[in-house]
């Protein structure tokens, strides 16, 4: 279901997209969060996609419960299969919109979202919702992309054009492809007062990763 607050998910769920998303792990996408994970902690994983990061988080907090949500039921089926493959029993799934979660206040020790806010029409509203469902003393953990920060060498006109077109398409669809640089401002606007900004990157430099990219 969509409304005036919804953005179009620019990436879609073609197998080529899912293949890239399956490469993601908690170690390469949420390393900043790992030291804070404890057995028994409850986790809300927002925009879980195919579930690889979800599975890593669930293994770290087991037997603590993990609720993995996504706006798209089809990709939740993919995530469910991933969790079954890992024989994890502490994960449940639900469809939900991060801008209106429909969950009780103070429900989770950790609320996590990786590369979600770039696709959301109202990221501040989404952050307010994340804050609402996080328990006092808990952690809202956000990491997001910043496409304007992409660099490559040698410069290739085709990649320059791709980046320009992607950013235009993402914004036309209601998203913000340079969400990363805006996270601090959004969090402040959403009412967070204890904020620890950090950054990370992916480096595609080996023959394997260059071929994949």
Task: Name every feature range the model reports, one short phrase each.
Residues 2-11, 15, 194-213:
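C-terminal helical/coil "lid" or tail adjacent to the Rossmann-like core of SAM-dependent
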Residues 5, 42-44, 50-100, 125:
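Class I SAM-dependent methyltransferase SAM/SAH-binding core
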Residues 23-39, 56, 60:
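Conserved alpha-helix/loop element of class I SAM-dependent methyltransferases that forms part
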Residues 38, 62, 120-121, 134-136:
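Helix-to-beta-strand junctions that scaffold the AdoMet/dcAdoMet cofactor pocket
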Residues 99-110:
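A short acidic, Gly/Pro-enriched loop at the edge of an enzyme's catalytic core
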Residues 109-122:
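A short SAM/SAH-binding and catalytic strip from SAM-dependent methyltransferases
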Residues 124-139:
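A short glycine-rich, Lys/Arg-flanked "PGG" loop and its adjoining helix->strand segment in the class I
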Residues 141-209:
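Conserved catalytic/acceptor-binding region of the Class I
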